[in-house]
Amino acid sequence: MTSNKQPEVNIGLVGHVDHGKTTLVQALSGEWTDQHSEEMKRGISIRLGYADATFRRCPEAEEPEAFTVDEHCDDHDVDTDHLRTVSFVDAPGHETLMATMLSGAAIMDGAVLVISATEPVPQAQTEEHLSALDIIGIDNIVIAQNKVDLVDEERAMQNYEQIQEFVEGTVAEGAPVVPISAGQEANIDLLIEAVQSEIPTPERDPDEDARMMVARSFDINRPGTTWDDLMGGVLGGSLVGGQLDADDEIELRPGREVEEGGKTEWQPVTTTVRSLQSGGDFVDTVTPGGLLGVGTGLDPAITKGDALAGQVAGPPGSLPPVHETFTMDVDLLERIVGDDGGEVDEISTGEPLMLTIGTATTVGSVTSARDDECEVALKRPVCAASGSKIAINRRVGARWRLIGVGTLR
């Protein structure tokens, strides 16, 4: 299941906790996305998990059986043809991790909504994730009706009808529903066929400035590494425009918080691209699509533990402005997304909101709210262009709940 082709599209795997998203990634890519030790303990994806999968086609077989992820077709004893490599973003389904899901949605070109046939539709996070796709405007969607091997035909049919009813009037209306069993790897060919037709590779402009949304950052050095062997910090995320080459100089904004003369301010960080990893291989150049790792000259102490997640990277001087306060046009949902689903009240001055812009999540305090706009002072600044979409979450009880979408003025 290996491939040296760069991924060209990012596909989100979204849906309720334990509905089988991570198992599905494993069936498609042979990789398990839960790499985080805490995730192994809790059995849920906490940070975004990434895995690449290469879709292939057997030249001798009829469709849809021809679609596969295997390099060799045993039935016809021939090597399969490469179609394209895609990156899967496995977004957490646990409700307290909604912010992570939203920041992941910023780099998705399409999504597979995984819904288990063993439970009534919709479950709370299924609804929440679909609202997030709606808000961010992701409408290339395929629905995987998973675990059909665990129910009888009548129950599977009831579940299918519930799914159709649930997606009516949303971005997923009309999306194909593919019955699968990720655990048994059944109907994976049908799922690949649906993804190939519903989630095309977007057209990209290679001549624009490189722009990378940083979703993760790491220190890859093992404890006890000697000074001579120390590797620079690594950024993980997605290139959304232009192309990036090894040895390019890049700037990260908003950068780092620096204390000078008793005052703290945010300063951009500049570094050199030391290495590029895409599709599991080291490459000299990356273009948009897929998820990439960028080895840098940064001190690993400032990249460890996702400390630079939410930054934007690109050639120095080319990035959008950094905002410590901003005004946004607000479009509220009618009801709070989640299991209790009360009505959404207007935003009021002084209330705290959790805002997700691109891959950045920050808390802001509303300094002024009137009609369909509000001004917000941010705890952590964000780098974002005018017109950027903002997912707005409000504290309801002990949790942050999605209540609407903002557009940056």
Swiss-Prot record:
Q: Which PROSITE patterns match?
A: G_TR_2
Q: Which GO terms describe its molecular function?
A: GTP binding; GTPase activity; metal ion binding; translation elongation factor activity; translation initiation factor activity; tRNA binding
Protease found in the keyword field: no
Region named G5: 181-183
Please verify whether the record's keywords include Chaperone: no
Q: Where is this region: G1?
A: 15-22
Annotated region (G2) at 43-47
Swiss-Prot/TrEMBL catalytic activity: GTP + H2O = GDP + phosphate + H(+)
Location of the region described as G3 in the Swiss-Prot/TrEMBL record? 90-93
Q: What is its EC number?
A: 3.6.5.3
Q: What class of enzyme is it?
A: hydrolase
Region: G4, residue numbers: 146-149
Annotated keywords: GTP-binding, Hydrolase, Initiation factor, Magnesium, Metal-binding, Nucleotide-binding, Protein biosynthesis
User: Which example biological process does GO assign this protein?
Assistant: formation of translation preinitiation complex
In this chain, Mg(2+) 1 is annotated as bound at T22, S45
Job of this protein: eIF-2 functions in the early steps of protein synthesis by forming a ternary complex with GTP and initiator tRNA.
Q: Which family does it belong to?
A: Belongs to the TRAFAC class translation factor GTPase superfamily. Classic translation factor GTPase family. EIF2G subfamily.
Protein's name in the database: Translation initiation factor 2 subunit gamma
Source species, please?
Haloarcula marismortui (strain ATCC 43049 / DSM 3752 / JCM 8966 / VKM B-1809)
Which gene carries the instructions for this protein?
eif2g
